[in-house]
Structure formats: structure tokens, C-alpha cells
Amino acid sequence: MKVIAVTGYKPFELGIFKNDHPGVGCIKKALHRKLTTFVEDGLEWVIISGQLGVELWAAEVVFEIQVEYPDLKLAVFTPFLEQEENWKEDNREYYEFILSQADHVDSITKRKYESPEQFKLKNQFFIEKSDALLAVYDEEKPGSPKYIVETAKKKGEIENYHSYFILFSELQDIIEEEQWNNAE
């Protein structure tokens, strides 16, 4: 596996409204564990669409991993131009920082938002251009990742395409591990 697409929930879907929320650290730790394993097995590129939440947290994790594995690259392929234009200023600044550090940035449709079809095109693009999908996703709580996960599963039924998931139970294990370590 050379290229993995990473996605997951938006912050509000998880009840997270600031990047210093303790849940963000747990999600980033889970992403770090999975991505490091994949890098050790030959992963070269992580691709995201740049949406707030899991995808931008994954970008931060890639930057951390690059310290030890500088050949790992991050690409941000936005579904349309200026996706951040209606975001709050602090979210725009955070997003622009991630883009400034990415190894490659492009827009899939090369135009501003016109219709939900652009998200469908984004999902298809990500599944076509990657060897696997990593999603912070639990079928018990479908949310925004549902559509790309369905697209990935369809491809997996006809081709050698893998979907990897970080489930809420894994995040709960990390929380308990942190509590255990802090109690010692």
C-alpha cells in the first residue's frame, strides 16, 4: 500500500468544538498508531480533502510522523475551490496552516461550490487514487463519512481495496489507557 485516503467525522459530529478538546488527542493517538504501522509497511502518501475534524487532525499526525519518516507525504485534494470561505476565522487559519505544510494541494473540480455532486466526485476520486481507506468511523453512528465508506466498500467487493476503521471502542481503550497511565 503506497497511498491511503484518511477521513472521519467532522468535529461537531463528535461534540468537539475546539482543537484542545481531550477527544482530539485520543483520535490523533489512534491515527498515529495506524499510520505509523502503514508507513513501516511502505506507505508513501496520505491524502485528505481538508475537511475540519479527523482529516485535519490526520494532517497534524502526518507532520509528526514526518520527523521520523521524512519520506511520508501529505496531499490535500479539496472537493472544490475555497471550501473554507464560510468558516470561522480561527478554522480558516488552521486550515491554511495545514495547506501551507502539505506536500501537494489541489482542487478536484477546479471550481467553487456548485452542488453536492462535487462531494460525490471527491469520494470517487479518493477511492480511485488510493490503495486503501482509513476512517474514524463507526457504523452505529453513520455521519458524514458514510458515503465515502460505502464507495470504498463497493470497490473492495470487486477489487483488492481495503478499508480500515478506528472505532469508538478503540478510542475508548485509548482514553482508559491514558487514565491508567495518569493514575500511576
From Swiss-Prot:
It holds the Pfam family YpsA. HAMAP family: UPF0398. Belongs to the UPF0398 family. This is UPF0398 protein BCG9842_B3730. The lineage of its organism: Bacteria, Bacillati, Bacillota, Bacilli, Bacillales.
